[in-house]
Amino acid sequence: MNRSPTAILQISRRAALALTVALLGACAQMAPAPDPLPSWNEGPAKDAIVQFVRKTTDSASPQFVPPAQRVATFDQDGTLWVEQPMYAQVAFALDRVKDVVKAQPALANEEPFKAVVTGDRAAMARFTEGDLLKIVGASQAGLSIEAFREVVKAWAATAKHPKFQRPYTELVYAPMVEAMKYLRANGYRTYIVTGGGQEFVRAFADAVYGVPPEQVIGSMLKVDYSVRNGVPTMTNAPAVFFINDKAGKPVGINMVIGQRPQAAFGNSDGDQQMLEWTTGGAGARLGMLVLHDDAQREYAYGPAAGLPASHVGTFAQSLYDEAKAKGWTVISIKNDWKRVFAFD
């Protein structure tokens, strides 16, 4: 059958188009997938995360985890952002003391508030945990939940870290944010399980980490319900309701999530029980601890692995030994992270 030149040209165009599509498809298959963890150096820590995700999300894997059970928990201070030289919430509460005393002048003559107002650093250095709890409690007592979150946001927008001279919300660890995003992209719900104040972290968790308020579990003050000027209101009271630290973390997880996580990330003695609870379950489990061993890019403290001791974010040698014995991965900031912060 004779074909006209026009028909032949049309066939040639279709063939060329088909060939182009085929070549593009082949190139796409050959191109490597984007690295989901670009801020991590190649090594055991990065491999542990990738292999865990692969085996728990592959339906053909004997360690497959149904989507409804995919839960990963992250401590915040020292795990997701800088906790030295003092916890961010303590810095916030100290900054709030002047406003608190202005509203309640009698506190100016009471410790521990007097030491803060007068700038008595020697007295502040002797603050006990109870003193700090008083200051933290006073920083939010009497404020509605909504009002307190706005106060936190305003502080976070202006307060700067003494070493880095950047807002605390910029001092989040890029590798850990990538790990959270990677887990979420594979069907995991990521929760922040912090010893810090629940409402404090909820004020910025979504914007900074992509974690909504309902997926933040933290220490809580008592909250009172009342109707103010016809408006139902939840107000913080100056009394502790629950401390979400150490053995409290598994309790908080059970209370809010209602199931054992598949993965848990921490950095200190306060996270020990959360990792024990998480990795004590059946099937594939992942436990990881961040070791701060990079004084040049961040801080170095332990005292695990011979690092300097610290009362903030203590990582004891006994926890390090337990991690090695139970197969938890210890993340070395110095060796495992290509960069620490997004601005590096």
Region annotations inferred by a language model:
Residues 2-23, 27-76, 98, 102-104, ...:
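Non-catalytic pre-domain segments flanking phosphatase-related domains
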Residues 3, 31-40, 44-50, 54, ...:
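C-terminal cap/substrate-recognition subdomain and adjoining C-terminal extension
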Residues 26, 59-63, 88, 103, ...:
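Generic macromolecular interface patches on structured domains
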Residues 27, 76, 84-87, 93:
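N-terminal low-complexity, Ser/Thr- and acidic-residue-enriched intrinsically disordered segments
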Residues 58-60, 81-83, 225-226:
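Short, solvent-exposed loop/turn elements at domain surfaces
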Residues 70-85, 275:
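Asp-based phosphoryl-transfer active-site loop
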Residues 82, 90, 200-201:
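Short catalytic/ligand-binding loop motif for oxyanion handling, primarily in non-cytosolic enzymes
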Residues 86, 91-170, 174:
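A metal-dependent, Asp-based hydrolase signature
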